[in-house]
Amino acid sequence: MMESFMKIAVYCGASVGNEPSFATAAQELGQWIASRKNTLVYGGGKAGLMGVLADAVLENGGQVIGVIPTFLKDRELAHPGLTELHVVETMSERKRKMFELSQAFVALPGGPGTLEEITEMISWSRIGQNPNPCAFYDVNNFYHATRALYDNMVENEFLTQADREKIGFAQTTQELEAFIQAYEPPVIRQY
């Protein structure tokens, strides 16, 4: 069930990518987060989709919490207008802090870091360490191959169908909201 005023972690690229639809989707997601009075939790950067997303939330009256490691802040990559900025020492601390602050996890298009961050949250769900929903915001089928990989894991019995259904793939904010509202954590499997 979607809580009122959730904190939603969004992982995304520090680049805007090569499709205008990626930035458009980041803007739409930011507007949706603000319109629902939710708070964005993200990597704290001003570049790429991260900056587009944070700006969209802020421009629509929303709250934004950034979590950035010192080495990135020192390179002047932190967004200057955030509601809160947490500075941590390492990427591992950043991921842990974002996890502690958030009630849902979403991945916009991004690179290996984006994929690694959302995948870790999915993995934690499967072992009972993350009771919150994880979803890919699948802009222009960006995550089509990822979806196929999870389906292949089911086919080859490395992932149960029940656990696969706990991994969201949404192409609109309406689909994303419906997934978050209906989410129930996976049952922890017994070995």
Region spans (language model):
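A cross-family phosphate/adenosyl-ligand binding-site feature
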Residues: 2-101, 139-174, 178, 183-191
